[in-house]
């Protein structure tokens, strides 16, 4: 299961905060330009005696510097907005296991992990709380479903509890194949695409 399905609702919520930050940045940009125009006008008058050409050059220089400063500020605010949104995503990722839909997400992550290692005799690693969510009857149903899909005998044995936020880690019995579908690993793997999606949605 991709990070997009896990985080789309969170990105939507974070969008509200991002729009506020961007509005403030744009207001600050306008303030910088307005101040620069006023400064340029004052300096233009002060050096009018030196000639219109010098005055115009000074005005253009001040405005160019102001535009550069405003652009830099806007880029900084853009990156700040993306970072704040990512932090919000990470905060909500920690809360995801508490939500009603989490069990379905966990089951899909397990199925995806089993697919990626090819089935067979496997070790299932979860955090302590999730081992209570995936009881023996659920595990048996998963094994049966994967056998039907893969046309291969698949056995999921519970391993040790891991210190992960949620999700799962699937290993083959001989340890040669590992699928890390923990929530944090899934998020990290898709970080670049998540950043791109945030930028696309917000800007």
UniProtKB/Swiss-Prot annotation:
Family: Belongs to the V-ATPase E subunit family.
Organism field: Methanococcus maripaludis (strain C7 / ATCC BAA-1331)
SUPFAM superfamilies: V-type ATPase subunit E-like
Subcellular location: Cell membrane
Origin superkingdom: Archaea
Gene Ontology CC terms: plasma membrane; proton-transporting two-sector ATPase complex, catalytic domain
Entry annotated with the keyword Nucleus: no
Record note on quaternary structure: Has multiple subunits with at least A(3), B(3), C, D, E, F, H, I and proteolipid K(x).
Protein known as: A-type ATP synthase subunit E
Cited PANTHER family: ATPASE H+-TRANSPORTING V1 SUBUNIT E1A-RELATED (PTHR45715)
Keyword match Cell membrane: yes
Membrane topology, as annotated: Peripheral membrane protein
A GO biological process held by the record: proton motive force-driven plasma membrane ATP synthesis
